[in-house]
């Protein structure tokens, strides 16, 4: 609003200028920051240092390989069946039917004391198509505690880390290495004989569930028991702690098709054991008993542990009550029991490797006589007592060691039989080959028998067999060869020498599958008669016999007059020859009695009926034998030289074999 005219307006306000002085701020010195990359490198170095302190021993060797484990076959019923159990330990990771043959992986592993796995892939290659074969599903399960038997079912398998593979599918199962780590910063011990718990490692079990059916047959439901899958494992192992033990490379993995059943029974202390007379199974499981000497084991459990896996178990599982699950699982551990009966082999049964190491047996009464039917049995050797035996490493197939006789073998009447050895055989390259024909002149019997003459009223004596007939006899001479009888090979094989004593022959007749040329006394068409006054029973079930003649007698006999009937009594373990003497007794021999066998009632075979053999001429060995040793070494390794001096060719051969084995062992260690 403006002021009126003639009046002064309000006084204007005076403006003040405020001057502010700027203060100079001095920035604080800050510590220079390190680049982020430098800090990261420092952290990485710290992490690397910590890893080096905690990861365990340094890796000395890495080995990658492919192992063909075996095959899975069809299932005969609707049960859950364990087909294979494969230990991840590199000494045991081999073909399940390789025997004692070493593998590239086992040779490498035997040179170190620690192992672990960097990669493990399981390949299922189908061998049957889903269009033709149906009904079965296959499982693979990882078992962290592989040395312990457990009750198994489809549900327990699916609760573990597992794979489920239908028929006809090609499948790769990749097992994470973190699930295979060992107790020592991820490492496992190599030698399972030192500490089974920390060395055996995990295992992979392969199963089939439900009956396998051949779909091509529409009219009937036909089981298919052929191959379903081929199992291969591609793996990478890490090794540490160089500690060569060559014998660990040849631990046994073998599949045996038994021909004799396995029996479950109890020892006198009540412990559960299995017994068998099967030739191949006994030869394998008893191979640690060795030759009998003053320091040989004669009683108690054997040193070797064996894992046994079989398919045929369900039928007898109920016979051992609460322990039936052990049989149903199809896997257990056994140890040979020494000091048991000689006619059978006896093995203690354990539920785990740890129990076997402590000899903690199962005490459960067996109801009645229970047998596991003959079939396929997988046997895995878990321990090797002698780990450094010179020259024992096998690079190829080696025949099984013949079973050694139990007990003393001198004097010969004390020799005990070995179950399963044939009553008539030839022996070559460690193998017993049983006779397969029933012809004559196959064996000679000699000895100093206990003898007596008995007589009575006329009664029928002899056997009706082939063209042989019985006759009325009033007098019989008896020759008991049980104590002193010796059996020699006869005819064309006579150079084979002595093959049995009377005692070992009786064991062979009881346990062997092939009994030629011995005849069963109760066979169809064989009718025996024995006078009541003889004092011996009429030959029957469990007894065997041969017609024998004096070594100078080449005539054909169709009646019991003039021949010997040699009877092996199974119940009384006696070997007795009976001679019919209706007119006069034989005079006491003026030389050692020798008899040869004749096919009952038929003409003697005189070809080869001799009692000497041609002398073999020995020739000098190859002069270039030493070069066989030098060829094992590389040409540039001039420091490796051997100079073998021998006084004779025979000594050279023995020394040659020794140095060959030593050279092989050294080359393996060097590689």
Curated annotation (Swiss-Prot):
GO terms for biological process: symbiont-mediated suppression of host complement activation. Residues 407-609 are annotated as: P2 globular domains. It comes from the Viruses. Specific enzymatic cleavages by the host yield mature proteins. Keywords: Capsid protein, Host-virus interaction, Inhibition of host complement factors by virus, T=1 icosahedral capsid protein, Viral immunoevasion, Virion. Residues 25-39 have a biased composition (Basic residues). Residues 610-671 are annotated as: Acidic. Residues 1-11 have a biased composition (Low complexity). Gene3D superfamilies: 2.60.120.20. It is found in: Virion. Its main location: virion. GO terms for cellular component: T=1 icosahedral viral capsid. Residues 1-39 are annotated as: Disordered. InterPro entries: Astro_capsid_N, SP2_M, Viral_coat. It holds the Pfam family SP2_M. Self-assembles to form an icosahedral T=3 immature capsid. Belongs to the astroviridae capsid polyprotein family. This is Capsid polyprotein VP90. It comes from Turkey astrovirus 1. The lineage of its organism: Viruses, Riboviria, Orthornavirae, Pisuviricota, Stelpaviricetes.
